[in-house]
Swiss-Prot record:
It comes from African swine fever virus (isolate Pig/Kenya/KEN-50/1950) (ASFV). It catalyses: ATP + H2O = ADP + phosphate + H(+). It is found in: Virion. Its EC number is 3.6.4.13. SMART domains: HELICc. This is Early transcription factor large subunit homolog. InterPro entries: Helicase_C-like, P-loop_NTPase. Belongs to the DEAD box helicase family. DEAH subfamily. Residues 52-352 form the Helicase ATP-binding domain.
């Protein structure tokens, strides 16, 4: 076979020599030297000082980046490696992606799947399927549908998806029409992935769903309470060992259970998986000892049930493949290694690897060597700490010891328990064992109704989750008031919880506050206020639990100390998100406007759609500094699959189930490019790990000590697992000292000893064609940076490593033949010419007399993408112009003879010194008003109070006071400086534009209906007025109300009355309209022009009155359409 077998003695060496893998060794490059060499020898691109060096045919841009870049998604080297390793052309059946969080495992899995999909498309019939199984399958689908480079959607579809998503978010409702349109579009795209008739090859399942669909319990099985786990059980749960006969004969036992009518295996799924691909994300969830389930059994069955040559290929993913217990290595290896390649062709047993005879588990002699051997060629390991892409991780606090032994790796914020907590802890006796329903004592205790005053001697608190709710619910009203406790009654979606001043740092004098009940949460609250005072930065607070002392009480603590949820209105005690001062004391601060500090919360009892919306608001670029949402509180639902952007502080209030899951929590906020929008000095995350302590250490510190001890054993297994990682020589991960993510580790092969390059598989399996495409992209980016090249300069630039941002492969291994082929495809044609040739669509080839080389010059293209030929070609913009369609009629009506704003503004200042200001609405076009509104909002133009009042009377402009009744909207502009009367937005015909930053001139658009503006208000029964632009003038036009038009039966579309200039209507019609409008004047002596002015002004006055009635913008009668009103379409439909 072309590729080496896994059992070959020099497997990794043979693999590393192949060009498709060797080229992924990213060579070290001194960037300063690279820039110097480039400018001195062959290329002048951009950056400071570029004009002083290098040869060029055009002026350089000293403010440009010194390196060109390729736009769009570019797979990084680790992703390219596994794509090349696990594909239909290689014999390798199973692979574990052991990559740290945030490094792109999902993209890598999709890239692998795409190779198999391309292969399956060649099948005439019975093409296999690609199964994506895991709790995060929705995230993988999202990646597939937002990355056109992956080949599942077009750029146009992605643009449409973003448009619909933006509109749906603005609607503020998951059930709105806009949201339904978005969901329909997404469903259409998703069906393309899963519907074979539409070219789909994917099936997506959650672990539970996959297991339940694979194993269908029959009615007979249900009668006998049959459980699949009974066929795959641990023979001694106390010892946690497996019965060898049970595990080795599992497939046979499933067949027997099926024969006995207890179970029915889903044969459709089995046939779809035959020869297919199985992708399982967060694989550690399927065999976790602490959470018993049948997920792993289902995966093990589909991998073992087929003959080896028909079994599905498999890709497993996890940053922490072993979590709950080191003995999970047995389950992992049984999934990762095909049955026939395990020792003696039988599944591994725990007693083969571990000694469990004493009080602790130990690795057996030679067990780690066996792990090394079995994992060779089956593991990809990536640990990326490059500070160019990842934020720096900073631990607050200090290292602690427990029973004279220093705890490794972690720094803690030590929180001594309060006296009341200590007294409560005594109730559990010496060296207490904390049960699962008593975990609250790690964090806090609750007031106890058994004692009238909590300060009396020997008083102790409540902490047990089965006793506390009942005891507090039965407490008297007087006791609750006396102790500052408020009961939050449970509902269908809201569990029992408490609030009140006992959670405050500064309670009333007669009430014991937060410091009395919790040392940990008191320290947390003090740290939060300190962080806010220090400056900007978002905060993530994690707690593993929801109820009792979990995230629900954390939200009450924040609210009791002046931090609001997403929708509450500020009060006197609300804290400022910039300085942490309460609102009542904020008048003394002159350097910034009061912005209420807010938080949001994510936990399992909140609907997914609501969680997604809150996460989107927290991650939004407009919330980069945390001024809209400063804090997010999350339970264990955030541990996997969610990404948080630009978080500066992470507060961990409780240990997850184990240390590997703690690493996952760290990874939520330390992710690739997660902080790129922040200034370089703010690209860091400070982690606060809070622990409650007692004078002798305490039960929570003891829990950390035990879990860290277990984790050291897991780390030993991790080191063995990664020892012979397939990509160790390319990822070049060298760890010199123990760290949280890994013990010391060196790759078994280094770049220096890879050996000579082997080309046979590179050329045989299409990698040469891919190289041509890569070179073509590089050439295009070089031409976009500089329009004139010689052949030798261009080849040197293409073959220089790391010259192009986003390309990290070893360009020195590029073939010049492939470069020439790429250049031919971009520039040459069959035609020959002597002096000037323009071919194809990228570059011009010019022969310069007395020069040894042709010049390659970027072509200028017309809208048809045909080259334009003239002597200035080489200095023109390389980008082809965009072709736009223009509606001539609309252009003539709205575009020609427009007067500039400055001219109209001067005219306005002159004409409206004495005239009624309302008339400005009908004398100036929409463009003037929109420019004026933005000037009023951004620049606060002086002397415009009367105009502002007109805009506000007609609900065209909005102040902060106008937005305050809408809490969800107000938070968008609450941080904008100014008092309640400050203008912050204006209405257009489609939306309301709200200012988010005057300095940056950034706006946020929301639908009109979110401010109770109804664009389809009922028209009056008399006449409708509006202004229409005719060149430089505006004409007053009238038409019958739309309900009258709909009643008339018109057989000739030319007779449809769409409106006419008022002066052109007959005198009789004008007088009739005036009478109906109540214009009581002697109309016989009034000219048609003056009569129309009276009608116009009357309609405008009635429109203002209608809008100012209660709920007028929703239900008021329509009389006049202003410049920002959308006219209904008048179309003949008969």
């Amino acid at each position: 076979m072309a590729y080496p077998e896994l059992d070959a003695a020099d497997f990794l060496q043979q693999l590393a020599r192949r060009k498709e893998f060797k080229s992924l060794i990213s060579p070290p490059v001194d960037q300063k030297k690279l820039i110097h060499d480039l400018r001195s020898h062959f290329v002048q691109i951009g950056g400071p000082g570029c004009e002083k060096g290098g040869r060029a045919f055009f002026p350089c841009d000293p403010y440009a980046s010194p390196f060109p870049s390729i736009k769009g998604l570019q797979l990084h080297n680790a992703q390219l490696f596994v794509q090349n390793f696990q594909n239909p052309n290689t014999p390798y059946s199973r692979l574990l992606l052991n990559w740290q969080t945030g490094t792109g495992k999902s993209i890598a899995a999709i890239a692998i799947a795409r190779q198999f999909m391309n292969h399956y498309m060649n099948f005439i019939e019975n093409a296999p399927w690609i199964f994506v199984v895991g709790f995060t399958r929705a995230i993988i689908q999202t990646e597939m549908l937002r990355r056109p480079e992956l080949g599942f959607v077009s750029y146009k579809e992605v643009a449409e998806l973003h448009r619909l998503l933006h509109i749906a978010k603005q609607s503020g409702s998951t059930t709105s029409v806009e949201s339904r349109h978005l969901n329909g579009f997404v469903s259409t795209l998703k069906r393309r992935l899963t519907d074979r008739n539409r070219g789909g090859f994917f099936q997506f399942y959650g672990y539970k769903e996959f297991a339940s669909k694979l194993f269908n319990i029959t009615s007979k099985g249900e009668e006998k309470n049959f459980d699949v786990l009974s066929l795959f059980h641990r023979s001694d749960e106390a010892e946690d060992t497996l019965n060898e006969n049970d595990i080795s004969q599992f497939v046979q036992k499933i067949s027997e259970a099926e024969s006995n009518g207890l179970i029915r295996v889903n044969q459709k799924i089995m046939e779809q998986l035959r020869g297919g691909l199985l992708i399982a994300d967060e694989i550690h969830n399927v065999y976790n000892i602490q959470e018993r389930n049948n997920y792993g059994i289902a995966l093990q069955y589909v991998l073992d049930a087929f003959p080896p040559h028909q079994a599905p290929r498999a890709v497993f993913m996890s940053a922490t493949p072993v979590t709950g217990s080191v003995m999970e290595y047995v389950d992992l290896l049984n999934l990762l290694v095909p049955r026939h390649e395990l020792p003696n062709g039988q599944p591994l047993q725990r007693q083969q690897l571990f000694d469990n005879s004493g009080h602790s588990v130990k690795w057996k002699k030679d067990a780690l060597a066996l792990v090394e051997r079995l994992s060779t060629g089956r593991v990809s390991f990536l640990l990326d700490t490059n500070t160019n892409y990842y934020p720096e991780r900073i631990f607050a606090g200090k290292m602690l010891s427990y029973r004279n032994e220093m705890l490794p790796y972690l720094h803690f914020i030590e929180c001594p328990m309060s006296d009341y907590q200590l007294e409560t802890l005594k109730q559990l006796g010496p060296d207490p064992k904390i049960s699962s329903n008593a975990y609250s004592i790690y964090d806090m205790v609750f007031p106890n109704p058994k004692f009238s005053k909590q300060t009396e001697p020997k008083a102790y608190g409540l902490f047990n989750s089965t006793e506390t709710p009942a005891a507090l619910s039965m407490a008297s009203t007087d006791w609750l008031l006396e102790n500052g406790v408020q009961i939050i009654e449970p509902s269908r979606r809201t569990p029992f919880n408490v609030s009140g001043s006992f959670l405050s740092l500064q309670p009333p004098t007669h009430i014991s506050g937060l410091a009395f009940y919790s040392g940990k949460y008191t320290q947390m609250m003090k740290d939060i206020l300190s962080i806010i005072r220090q400056g900007r930065g978002k905060i993530l607070i994690y707690h593993n639990r929801v109820r009792m002392s979990g995230v629900l009480i954390l939200q009450e603590i924040l609210q009791s100390n002046g931090i609001l949820n997403e929708v509450s209105s500020p009060v006197g005690t609300t804290r400022c998100s910039i300085c942490a001062a309460i609102r009542d004391d904020h008048t003394t601060h002159s350097d910034h406007q009061f912005i209420p500090a807010r938080f949001t919360i994510l936990h399992s009892e909140i609907e997914p759609a609501v969680r997604e919306r809150s996460l989107a608001l927290f991650n939004a670029s407009s919330n980069l500094e945390g001024h809209q949402l400063r804090i997010l509180i999350g339970s264990k639902v955030i541990v996997e699959g969610l990404n948080f952007q630009a978080v500066r502080y992470e507060m961990i209030m409780s240990l997850p189930l184990d240390i590997p899951r703690l690493i996952q929590v760290f990874g939520r906020v330390v992710r690739k490019n997660s902080h790129m929008e922040l200034p370089p000095n703010e690209r860091n995350v400070t982690i606060y790990l809070y622990v409650s302590t007692t004078p002798d250490g305490g039960p929570e510190l003891a829990k950390y000590a035990q879990k860290l001890k277990e984790y050291i054993l897991i780390q030993e297994g991790d080191k063995a697992l990664r020892k012979h990682a397939i990509d160790g020589f390319t990822n070049q991960i060298k760890i010199d000292k123990p760290m949280l993510e890994s013990l010391p580790l060196s790759p078994s092969i280094t770049p220096a000893n890879v050996g000579a390059t082997v080309l046979n598989t590179f050329e045989a399996y299409g990698y040469g064609e891919q190289e041509v495409k890569t070179i073509s992209n590089i050439i295009i980016s070089l031409f976009m940076a500089r329009p004139v090249w010689t052949y030798s300069e261009l080849w040197k630039a293409v073959s220089t490593p790391k010259l192009i941002q986003g390309i990290t492969i070893d360009n020195k291994l590029f073939s010049e033949d492939n470069f020439a082929l790429a250049l031919v495809s971009l520039c040459y044609s069959k035609n020959q010419c002597k002096e000037l040739c323009i071919q194809n669509r990228l570059c011009t080839i010019m022969h310069v007399p007395a020069k040894p080389e042709h010049l390659y010059i970027a072509a200028v293209l017309n809208y048809k993408k045909e080259p334009v030929l003239d002597i200035e070609t080489y200095i023109r913009d390389f980008q082809p112009p965009t072709m736009h369609s223009i509606r001539i009629t609309k252009y003539l009506e709205h575009s020609q003879t427009k007067e500039p704003f400055q001219v109209l503004y001067e005219k306005f200042q002159k004409d409206f010194q004495d005239e009624p200001m309302e008339q400005v609405l009908i004398h100036y076009p929409a463009s003037f008003h929109y420019t004026m509104l933005e000037a009023l909002i951004i620049d606060n133009l002086a002397g415009m109070g009367a105009l502002v009042e007109v805009y506000k009377k007609f609900f065209i402009a909005f102040s902060k006071k106008d937005i305050q009744p809408f809490p969800d909207i107000f938070k968008i502009i609450s941080h904008v400086p100014g008092d309640d009367d400050t203008l912050v937005g204006y209405a257009t015909e489609d939306s309301v534009r709200l200012i988010t930053s005057r300095q940056d001139k950034t706006w946020h658009e929301i639908p009109l209906y979110m401010l109770n503006i109804n664009v389809k208000r009922k028209e009056n029964d008399i006449v409708i007025g509006y202004m229409e632009s005719k060149g430089k003038t505006l004409k007053f036009k009238i038409r019958p109300p739309i309900q009258v038009l709909k009643k008339n039966e018109i057989t000739d579309i030319r007779m449809l009355n769409r409106g006419a200039v008022c002066e052109t209507r007959g005198r009789e019609e004008q007088q009739k309209i005036a009478d109906q409008l109540g214009i009581s004047l002697n109309l016989t002596k009034i000219s048609a022009i003056k009569l129309c002015l009276l009608i116009r002004n009357t309609l405008l006055q009635k429109e203002m009155e209608a809008r100012n009635q209660p709920n007028g913008m929703q239900d008021g009668i329509r009389w006049f359409y202003l410049f920002n009103d959308k006219m209904p379409s008048l179309v003949h439909t008969s």
